[in-house]
Structure formats: structure tokens, C-alpha cells
């Protein structure tokens, strides 16, 4: 078992753009993730790589970087920032950090709410 639990849920942005929501949760007793955890980490099966991926969860920067790289074959990859949302509960913005799609560009902020299924 990995020290980082990954859960994927099909979802859409507030504008209706479909994507895969990748929720990351550290599951160690101390709440601390070590770099060695990356060696046993696997992206969940069933990802729809023709859609974008939003990575969300409390993570060290190096772990988020690893997940961005691991998801690079997706149409686009974004990271979630709750400070970029609106007054809706669970809202935030997903900042696009990599793209192969004409529909989004690096630096775009996609408004979304965290799916209930990952809470």
C-alpha cells in the first residue's frame, strides 16, 4: 500500500468542461510523505487521458510535480488552488500547467467545485 492514496472521479468545470479529478491524500499516521513513497505510487486505472486532469489535495511540491509528470499524456493538466474560487462551498480554481489541447492554455484558471465523491 502506498503512503499516498489517489482517487479519480469524472467531473466537469463550472463552465461544463469535462475532466478527471485526481484527489491525493497522504495516509501515513504522521501525515508526512517521504520521497520514497513515489517508488510505489501508481496512477489509478481507468483514467480518460483524452480529457484533462485536475490534481487536488494537500501535497509536498515535489509530489505534485511527480503527479503532473505522471499525467502528462492527458489532454491537459491543472493543479487545484482553493484561493482562486468563489463563494461556493468546495470551490476553487484549477491552474492549467500543461496542455496538448486547443481548448485551454497554460495559465488558464478553470473554476470548479471539488466533487462530493472525494470528500
Enumerate the language-model features and the residues they cover.
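Acidic, metal-coordinating catalytic cores used for nucleic-acid/nucleotide bond scission
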Residues: 58-62
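Short glycine-rich phosphate-binding loop at a beta-alpha junction
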Residues: 52-57
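Long, low-complexity, Lys/Arg-enriched
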Residues: 1-50, 63-119
Amino acid at each position: 500500500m502506498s503512503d499516498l492514496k489517489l482517487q479519480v472521479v469524472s467531473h466537469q468545470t463550472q463552465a461544463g468542461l469535462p475532466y478527471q479529478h485526481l484527489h491525493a491524500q497522504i495516509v501515513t499516521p504522521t501525515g508526512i510523505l517521504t520521497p520514497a513513497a513515489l517508488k510505489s505510487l501508481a496512477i489509478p486505472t481507468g483514467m480518460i487521458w483524452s480529457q484533462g486532469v485536475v490534481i487536488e489535495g494537500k501535497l509536498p511540491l515535489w509530489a505534485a510535480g511527480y503527479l503532473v509528470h505522471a499525467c502528462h499524456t492527458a489532454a491537459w493538466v491543472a493543479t487545484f488552488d482553493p484561493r482562486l474560487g468563489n463563494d461556493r462551498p468546495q470551490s476553487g480554481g484549477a491552474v492549467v500547467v500543461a496542455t496538448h489541447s486547443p481548448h485551454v492554455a497554460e495559465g488558464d484558471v478553470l473554476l470548479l467545485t471539488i466533487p462530493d465523491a472525494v470528500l
